[in-house]
Amino acid sequence: MQVTSVGHAGFLIESRAGSILCDPWVNPAYFASWFPFPDNSQLDWDALGDVDYLYVSHLHKDHFDPEHLRRYVNKDAVVLLPDYPVPDLRRELEKLGFHNFFETTDSVKHTVSGPKGDLDVMIIALRAPADGPIGDSGLVVSDRVTTVFNMNDARPVDLDVLHTDFGQIDVHMLQYSGAIWYPMVYDMPARAKEAFGIQKRQRQMDRCRQYIAQVGATWVVPSAGPPCFLDPELRDLNDDHGDPANIFPDQMVFLEQLRIHGHDGGLLMIPGSTADFTGSTLNSLTHPVDDPESIFTTGKAAYIEDYAQRMAPVLAAEKARWAPSAGEPMLEALRALFEPIMTQTDQICDGIGYPVELRLTGRDHNETVVLDFPKRVVREPIPDEKFRYGFEIPAALVRTVLRDEEPDWVNTIFLSTRFRAWRVGGYNEYLYTFFKCLTDERIAYADGWFAEAHDDSSSITLDGFQIQRRCPHLKADLSKFGVVEGNTLTCNLHGWQWNLENGRCLTTKGHELRCQKL
C-alpha cells in the first residue's frame, strides 16, 4: 500500500484494490485566513483526482474544498460517506456532481468491492454538536496486508473497535496542532494569554500522544495542520518566531516530542511525499524536495514569506468577494436569521443563559446588536448594558455570511480568527453550538442531543477519587483521558476541567461530574 500526502489532512491511499483520495484542500479557507502548509497548489491534481474512491471527513473548509472537488476529482468516484444524523455532507457533494455513495454505518467494518478488488473500510463517525459542523470522522482502510487509520482531526471516544475488527494498525495519521481561535482573539492580560497559549500548545500534543498510545500503530504521520497564515494582518499567528505560546506547532516540533517520549515511528510527510508499506514494514519514503525538514526549521520564515508573495493575488481575489462593509443596519437581517432558531431550542438558549453582544464594525459601519437568549429575541442594546460575552466582528464578514446564507458561523467567521471576543467566566459551549446550527435541521438535532441524559452509571478510581467513567462533556473514557492534579480533573480530549471536591465544571456552566474522595 502507498500513502501519499497531498497536504494538510489530505492523503491519497493506493492499493491493488483501488485508490482513495481523502480531504483534498487547496484553496484558502475561512475568509482567506488559512492556507495549506506547506504549499500543495503545484501538485498534479489532474492525476490525483483520478481516483476510485473519495472520502471527505466533514464539512470544515480545510477538509471540504468544493471548488477543488468540482474542478479536479472524478465525479464517478465512489464516495465513502460517514454516518451523520444530518445529511448536509451528502447534499453538498451531490451539488458538485458526485452521485455514487457508499453509506457506511458508524464504527462498522464494511467491504467495498470494485473492478480492482476488495477493500475493508470503517468510518468512525462523531455526532456531538462539538464535533465539526455536526459531524467529524476518521477512516480505517485495509487491503488485508496493510491497515491505515486516517483520524485527521477527529476525536474518537472509543477506539477498541479498531483492534477488534482490524487487529494491528500499521499507519496512523492524526492532528496534533492547533485549529481554533483561542486564546488569540480574546481580550485578556498579555501574561494570562501567554499562559493559556503555552498550556494549550502542550495539551493538544499530549492529547495526540494519548491517541497514539491507544491505537498502537507502528508508524505515525502528524497531519491536519497547522495551517499557514499569509495575510499580513495574521502573519504573527505562524509559529516561526520562537513564541512558546503559539498554538500552531509544526510537524518537526511534534516529531521531536514523540522522540522525547520514546516513540521512533514518526514520519515527516509533506505534499508529494509517498510512503510505501507492506504491513508494518516501511519499504520506502520519498519526498519531492531534497531537504523537507528545512521548510519547518532554518528556512521556515523565508518559506512563508515567499509563499505569501506567490499567493498575494489569490488572497486579494478572495477579499474582493467579500460583501462591502457599508450598508443598511443589520439588526433586521440578524433578527430574521436568529430568532426562529432561538425559538426552537430551549436547551441551547437556556444553556447560554444571558444576552450576548455583537459589535459589527468597519470603516463605514458601526452597529451593536444584542442576542438576548433568555428572551429569545435579537434587539438593540439598552443604555449602559453590561455583557458577560461579546464579539467584535468586521461588518463585511457578517454581511457576507448573511448574503451567502451560511448555516455555520464557526465554519466561516470564527475559524478565520478575524474577530475579537471577551467574556466573564468560562467557555460557553452552548453559544458556539448555536452559531454552528443556523438551520432548522441542525438546531433540532443539537437540541435533542443536549436533552438526552448522559450515562454516568459506571465508575472508575483515579488517584484517590472515585469518579464517573464517562466525561460529562462528550463521554470520553476518563480512565484513558483523565488526569488528576491536586483536586482538579482534566479530560485531555478537549481540556475540560472539574473541581473534584464538589464535581463542579471549571470550564463552563453545567456538566457536573459525579465524584468522591476515597
Curated annotation (Swiss-Prot):
PROSITE patterns: RIESKE (PS51296). Residues 431-518 form the Rieske domain. The keyword Phosphoprotein does not apply. Pfam families: Lactamase_B_3, Rieske, SCP2_Rv3818. One of its GO terms (molecular function) is oxidoreductase activity, acting on paired donors, with incorporation or reduction of molecular oxygen. One of its GO terms (cellular component) is cytoplasm. Binds 1 [2Fe-2S] cluster per subunit. It is an enzyme of class 1 (oxidoreductase). Its EC number is 1.-.-.-. It comes from the Bacteria. There is a cross-link at residue 375 (Isoglutamyl lysine isopeptide (Lys-Gln) (interchain with Q-Cter in protein Pup)). Its cofactor is [2Fe-2S] cluster. [2Fe-2S] cluster binds at residues 471, 473, 491, 494. Keywords: 2Fe-2S, Iron, Iron-sulfur, Isopeptide bond, Metal-binding, Oxidoreductase, Ubl conjugation. PANTHER family: N-ACYL-PHOSPHATIDYLETHANOLAMINE-HYDROLYZING PHOSPHOLIPASE D. This is Putative Rieske 2Fe-2S iron-sulfur protein MSMEG_6410/MSMEI_6242. It comes from Mycolicibacterium smegmatis (strain ATCC 700084 / mc(2)155) (Mycobacterium smegmatis). The lineage of its organism: Bacteria, Bacillati, Actinomycetota, Actinomycetes, Mycobacteriales.
